[in-house]
Amino acid sequence: MISLDLSPTLWKSPDKEGELKKQGHVVKNWKKRKFIIQNDMLFYFKDKEERPVGAVPLRMSRCYENKSLGKPNCFELVSPRINKTFFIQANTPDEMASWMKAVEKGSEYSTVSQPFNLKHEVHVDFNSATGFSGLPKEWEVILKSSNVSKQEVLDKPSEWLSVLEFQAGRTMEKSNSQNLSALPDESNLTLSDLVTKEDPTKIYKNMTKIGEGAAGEVFVATSSKNNKRVAIKKIEINNDNAKLLVTEIAIMKTSHHDNIVNYIDSYIVNDRELWVAMEFMGGGCLTDILEAFDNIKMSEIQIAYVVKETLKALQYIHSLHRIHRDIKSDNILLGSEGSVKIADFGYAAQLTQKQQKRNTVVGTPYWMAPELIRGHDYGVKVDIWSLGIMMMEMAEGEPPYMDFPPLRALFLITTKGIPPLKETTKWSKTFQDFFSKCLDINVANRPDATDLLKHPFMDLACDSSEFKPLIQAARNV
């Protein structure tokens, strides 16, 4: 009988192997990994472990050099089968070229594969001769590389299928952005209706790149109108994201709150690029503090402060019947004076009278609420769950289940909820009570933003002057 453990036969005759650096998908640091390409699959391994920590289907993938990452010999690998982009760094230009050629060969591998998109009628079974039956080959490999045992699948087949369908749904929804409706009164609007007709290249000077995300690049510039610094987000416009950008800009233009990054204006440049001008937050993002976790720890009163300021913004957003859907440390920006503001409305949704719940699958997996992963209808309380996960980030340096592959993490979130804090004695009973309420699996019992702002934990929050030194300390690490 074949074990569900990933068989070494999948990589024992590699077409190419070697050590490269890979950028993390959640924490954006670069780490060395051993890479192996065999046929139409790429595997990468941590240290000297015999099992891969990741498996990438190469069929139909795209690969090209990326010079915008600030590192030499970097290439970008896009795998449409799992709708993921990987940033990889080689040691030399020749090595980069040879790996890109190997990826290209894998993308054109000629054996016939099963359809990738799952159907709801799929029945997960295990056959000792063929492995998982009813699943595409790529998902079988990913299940195995996620250390999923045969018994686990047989014990909870419907739960595992739910997680697999969730991932397939994410791919489908991202490639069909028209499924996400724009604001109800603005469903016929286009980007041209929302942007300013001025030429931003004549308004914003001294532009310097300060970051890069999934959606585009971020720059800091000086406005010639008032000599103030602003942040400029540049996003390439295409058929997949045009509707989403309309929703994002419409929501940003109509969201005015002290704890939301201020929208200034937006422009279309050369008919293919959207520039969004926003308030510049000189303290960076909350993630910058968390990446210095080994040297800098947030105190309980500082965590309470960040949570309180975030909740004020969520209370306002939810009062407009909107959901942010991507609350995490990356999207919490900090002012150099200690202010805390929510940013990035790229996943935000507007609820209407007819549609008071959503079932669209978007967000970042490790921060996602169980009801969202299961594909159930959901409302504003998914943001409260994500806030609870962000509390764990601040308390422990990272979200739960980060040591597990995303697939297993999603399964654990839906079946077991969130594990307890590692050092419970370090945190007050008030902290722990607030934390547990945010992460209540029962949506009906999970409080809303208004209720949480009345919780005693909020009384512990420090003010911006006591948070400011933390921002400065993180810069110096």
From Swiss-Prot:
Subcellular location(s) per record: Cytoplasm; Membrane
GO molecular function terms noted in the UniProt entry: ATP binding; metal ion binding; phosphatidylinositol-3,4-bisphosphate binding; protein serine kinase activity; protein serine/threonine kinase activity; small GTPase binding
Required co-factors: Mg(2+)
Source organism superkingdom: Eukaryota
Family of the protein in this entry: Belongs to the protein kinase superfamily. STE Ser/Thr protein kinase family. STE20 subfamily.
One Pfam family named in its UniProt record: Pkinase
Keywords: ATP-binding, Chemotaxis, Cytoplasm, Kinase, Magnesium, Membrane, Metal-binding, Nucleotide-binding, Serine/threonine-protein kinase, Transferase
Active site positions, chain numbering: 326
Role noted for this protein: Has role in the regulation of chemotaxis.
Domain CRIB: 112-125
InterPro entries reported for this sequence: CRIB_dom, CRIB_dom_sf, Kinase-like_dom_sf, PAK3-like, PAK_BD, PH-like_dom_sf, PH_domain, Prot_kinase_dom
Knockout mutant characteristics: Cells are less-polarized than wild-type and are unable to properly regulate the direction of pseudopod formation, resulting in a reduction in the distance traveled in response to chemoattractant.
Main location class: cytoplasm
One biological process term in Gene Ontology: mitotic cytokinesis
Regulation: Kinase activity is rapidly and transiently increased in response to chemoattractant stimulation.
Quaternary context: Interacts with GTP-bound racB.
Residue span, PH domain: 13-108
Annotated GO CC locations: cytoplasm; cytosol; plasma membrane
Reactions catalysed: L-seryl-[protein] + ATP = O-phospho-L-seryl-[protein] + ADP + H(+); L-threonyl-[protein] + ATP = O-phospho-L-threonyl-[protein] + ADP + H(+)
Top-level class of the enzyme under EC nomenclature: transferase
Result of altering residue 120 to L: High basal kinase activity, loss of response to chemoattractant, loss of racB binding
This protein's name: Serine/threonine-protein kinase pakC
SUPFAM superfamilies given in the database record: PH domain-like (SSF50729), Protein kinase-like (PK-like) (SSF56112)
UniProt EC number: 2.7.11.1
